[in-house]
Amino acid sequence: MATAMYLEHYLDSIENLPCELQRNFQLMRELDQRTEDKKAEIDILAAEYISTVKTLSSAQRVEHLQKIQSAYSKCKEYSDDKVQLAMQTYEMVDKHIRRLDADLARFEADLKDRMDGSDFESTGARSLKKGRSQKEKRSSRGRGRRTSEEDTPKKKKHKSGSEFTDSILSVHPSDVLDMPVDPNEPTYCLCHQVSYGEMIGCDNPDCPIEWFHFACVDLTTKPKGKWFCPRCVQEKRKKK
């Protein structure tokens, strides 16, 4: 029930994602078109300048070159806007992916705890059944063949149920949630895994890893001031 409710909430949270992505992609296409139009305008202005440069006065040359420079500046502005929009789009999708990764990790841990608890209860139940069965055997001695035959199906039924329970409990939670990983998704941290949950960046600009999961570096909250990863701290000590 809780899983179904979570799925419903998660689907609600990404309901507007396709529309937002479509809007951003449309804006990027428009910026592309504006850039191409500006580049065509620059080509025309450059051709005009080259063909008339000998007949233009100094003031006219400066004015013409300023038009070309202005067109170049506008073209760069469109390109910068497109890059910024692409980064926003990536962050928007990555936010949902990181949330899903974190929720899946919590769900897997919760599932493992529940199955461990079920395994403990099942072991106790089997011990109780075994003791009860031995007691029934002692009390049924001398009752005759008919009583013994009537007990046989019940014993088989208990055995079958126990085997079924064992087969369920033998399934590892990670097998249930085992999903293929995108080979193109970048990996981070000392664990070389994809980004998920809370992460912190190393303040060493030359750090080869850059980003780390809180749990992998024994953090629960973001520390104040600059923070350096264990590898960079160790390298710094070696240099001393």
Curated annotation (Swiss-Prot):
One of its GO terms (biological process) is regulation of cell cycle. Zn(2+) 1 binds at residues 189, 191, 213, 216. Its main location: nucleus. The modification Omega-N-methylarginine is found at residue 126. The keyword Ion transport does not apply. A zinc finger (PHD-type) spans 186-235. The modification Phosphoserine is found at residue 118. Residues 115-165 are annotated as: Disordered. GO terms for cellular component: histone acetyltransferase complex; MOZ/MORF histone acetyltransferase complex; nucleoplasm; nucleus. The keyword Transcription applies. Zn(2+) 2 binds at residues 202, 207, 229, 232. Disulfide bonds: none annotated. InterPro entries: ING_fam, ING_N_histone-binding, Zinc_finger_PHD-type_CS, Znf_FYVE_PHD, Znf_PHD, Znf_PHD-finger, Znf_RING/FYVE/PHD. CDD domains: ING_ING5, PHD_ING5. The record marks 188, 199, 203, 211 as: Histone H3K4me3 binding. One of its GO terms (molecular function) is histone H3K4me3 reader activity. Keywords: Activator, Chromatin regulator, Chromosome, Metal-binding, Methylation, Nucleus, Phosphoprotein, Transcription, Transcription regulation, Zinc, Zinc-finger. It is found in: Nucleus; Chromosome. Belongs to the ING family. Component of the HBO1 complex, which specifically mediates acetylation of histone H3 at 'Lys-14' (H3K14ac) and, to a lower extent, acetylation of histone H4. Component of the MOZ/MORF complex which has a histone H3 acetyltransferase activity. Through chromatin acetylation it may regulate DNA replication and may function as a transcriptional coactivator. Inhibits cell growth, induces a delay in S-phase progression and enhances Fas-induced apoptosis in an INCA1-dependent manner. PANTHER family: INHIBITOR OF GROWTH PROTEIN, INHIBITOR OF GROWTH PROTEIN 5. Component of the HBO1 complex composed of KAT7/HBO1, MEAF6, ING5, and one scaffold subunit: complexes containing BRPF scaffold (BRPF1, BRD1/BRPF2 or BRPF3) direct KAT7/HBO1 specificity towards H3K14ac, while complexes containing JADE scaffold (JADE1, JADE2 and JADE3) mediate acetylation of histone H4. Component of the MOZ/MORF complex composed at least of ING5, KAT6A, KAT6B, MEAF6 and one of BRPF1, BRD1/BRPF2 and BRPF3. Interacts with H3K4me3 and to a lesser extent with H3K4me2. Interacts with EP300 and p53/TP53. Interacts with INCA1. The PHD-type zinc finger mediates the binding to H3K4me3. This is Inhibitor of growth protein 5. It comes from Mus musculus. The lineage of its organism: Eukaryota, Metazoa, Chordata, Craniata, Vertebrata. The gene is Ing5.
